[in-house]
C-alpha cells in the first residue's frame, strides 16, 4: 500500500486539454483576448507554461485551438439556427435578440469571443489569424445561404441586393452589437440600435 502511494505520487499529472480550453475560452471571452496573459491562464487552469507549450505549441496554438473550440460549441448554435425553416423576418428578429441577450444566471459572458478575436486579428499569431479567416468565411457563407433561401421564398425585402454583400452587412451589424455588449453597454440599447440597422431587410 505504501509502495502504491509512492508510485502514484511520482507520476506526472495528466494534462487535461478540454479543461484548459474551457478555462481559456471563458477567460478570453469575459476579459478580452488581449487582456489575458498565458501566465494568468496557467494559474487559472492550474497547469504549467511548459505544459501549454507541449500541448499547443505556444500561445498562438492555444488561441487557435480556443477559437476552434468556441466555433464548435457556441457559433455552431447560431449557424444551425440559420438552417431552420423559420421565416426570414422572424429569424432576423430572433437573431437580433439572441445576439444581444444576457443571462445573469448564466456564467456565459456577454458579447462574442470571435468578434473580439477578429477585431484584434493583426495582433494575434499566424495560425490564429488563419483560423479567424476560415471561421469568418464559414459564418458569411451560412448567412449567404440563408439569404438565398429567403430570396427563393420571396421573404427577402431587398431582393436586388447581392446575397454576399447582405450577409457581410448583417454579420457586421451583429458583430458591432456584440462588441458593444462586451464593453458593458445595456443590452436593451444595443438591441434597439441593431434592430434599426437590420430594418432595411424587414
What are these model-derived regions, one by one?
Residues 102-105, 149, 167-187, 199-202:
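Amphipathic C-terminal alpha-helical segment
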Residues 65, 79-110, 163-170, 191:
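Hydrophobic alpha-helical connector segments
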Residues 34, 156, 183-186:
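Conserved hydrophobic residue
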Amino acid at each position: 500500500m505504501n509502495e502504491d502511494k509512492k508510485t502514484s505520487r511520482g507520476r506526472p499529472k495528466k494534462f487535461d486539454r478540454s479543461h484548459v480550453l474551457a478555462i481559456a475560452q471563458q477567460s478570453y471571452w469575459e476579459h478580452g483576448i488581449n487582456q489575458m496573459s498565458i501566465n494568468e491562464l496557467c494559474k487559472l487552469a492550474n497547469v504549467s507554461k511548459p505544459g501549454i507549450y507541449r500541448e499547443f505549441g505556444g500561445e498562438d496554438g492555444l488561441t487557435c485551438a480556443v477559437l476552434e473550440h468556441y466555433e464548435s460549441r457556441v457559433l455552431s448554435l447560431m449557424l444551425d439556427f440559420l438552417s431552420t425553416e423559420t421565416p426570414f423576418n422572424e429569424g432576423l428578429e430572433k437573431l437580433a435578440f439572441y445576439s444581444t441577450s444576457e443571462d445573469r444566471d448564466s456564467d456565459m459572458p456577454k458579447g462574442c469571443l470571435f468578434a473580439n478575436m477578429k477585431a484584434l486579428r493583426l495582433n494575434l499569431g499566424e495560425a490564429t489569424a488563419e483560423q479567424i479567416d476560415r471561421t469568418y468565411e464559414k459564418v458569411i457563407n451560412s448567412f449567404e445561404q440563408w439569404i438565398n433561401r429567403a430570396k427563393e421564398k420571396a421573404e427577402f425585402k431587398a431582393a436586388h441586393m447581392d446575397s454576399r454583400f447582405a450577409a457581410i452587412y448583417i454579420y457586421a451589424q451583429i458583430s458591432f452589437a456584440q462588441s458593444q455588449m462586451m464593453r458593458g453597454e445595456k443590452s436593451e440599447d444595443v438591441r434597439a440600435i441593431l434592430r434599426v440597422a437590420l430594418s432595411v431587410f424587414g
